[in-house]
C-alpha cells in the first residue's frame, strides 16, 4: 500500500513539475572593428536603431518608441521584435521579448552595439557583443555551428558598419 502511494505521488509530482529544464549555458561573442572616424561621426551613421536595415541587410520598422530610449521596439523582417533595455549616447543593448508575433526566444538572446573613442577621439572602435543561452541548441555540433553562423553574420555587419562610417 505504501509503495503504491509513493509511486502515485512521484508520478503526480513529475506531472505537476513538468519536464526537467537544462541548466543555462550562457555564451558571449565579442566582435570589434576600428574605424577612421570620430565616435560622433561613426554613431551618427550606424547608431540609429533601424540603421541595422543597412548594415545587417534586414527590414526594420520601429513599432514603439523613438529609436533612442529604453523601451523602443524594432521589428526585423516583419517577425523579430527587439526592445532597447539599456542605452547611452554611444550604445544600446537590446533583448528579444515575447510578443504576439514571436514566442519567447529559448536562447535568452541579448545584443549590445557600442562605439568607443580611440586615439584621443580621432578614431573609433565599434564593439558588438552577443549574449545568449546555447543550452537549447542541444548538441555540441549545433552549438558550434550556431556560434560560427552568428560570428560570420555579425563580422560581416561590422565590415558594413565600418564602410558606412567611413563613407563621405
For each predicted feature, which ranges?
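Bacterial N-terminal signal peptides
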Residues: 8-16
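Hydrophobic ligand-binding cavity/cleft-lining segments
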Residues: 18-65
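A short, structured loop/turn motif at beta-sheet edges
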Residues: 36-40, 84-90, 114-125, 167-168
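Extracytoplasmic/secreted envelope proteins and their assembly/folding machinery
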Residues: 39-49, 81, 112, 151, ...
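Bacterial N-terminal signal peptides that target proteins for export
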Residues: 1-9
Amino acid at each position: 500500500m505504501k509503495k503504491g502511494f509513493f509511486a502515485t505521488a512521484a508520478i503526480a509530482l513529475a506531472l505537476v513539475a513538468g519536464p526537467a529544464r537544462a541548466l543555462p549555458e550562457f555564451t558571449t561573442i565579442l566582435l570589434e572593428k576600428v574605424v577612421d572616424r570620430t565616435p560622433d561621426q561613426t554613431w551618427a551613421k550606424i547608431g540609429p536603431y533601424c540603421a541595422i536595415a543597412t548594415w545587417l541587410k534586414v527590414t526594420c520598422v520601429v513599432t514603439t518608441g523613438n529609436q533612442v530610449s529604453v523601451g523602443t521596439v524594432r521589428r526585423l523582417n516583419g517577425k523579430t521584435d527587439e526592445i532597447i533595455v539599456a542605452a547611452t549616447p554611444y550604445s544600446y543593448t537590446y533583448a528579444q521579448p515575447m510578443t504576439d508575433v514571436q514566442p519567447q526566444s529559448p536562447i535568452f538572446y541579448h545584443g549590445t552595439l557600442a562605439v568607443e573613442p580611440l586615439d584621443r577621439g580621432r578614431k573609433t572602435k565599434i564593439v558588438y557583443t552577443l549574449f545568449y543561452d546555447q543550452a537549447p541548441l542541444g548538441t555540441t555540433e549545433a552549438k558550434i555551428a550556431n556560434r560560427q553562423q552568428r560570428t560570420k553574420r555579425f563580422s560581416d555587419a561590422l565590415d558594413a558598419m565600418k564602410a558606412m562610417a567611413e563613407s563621405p
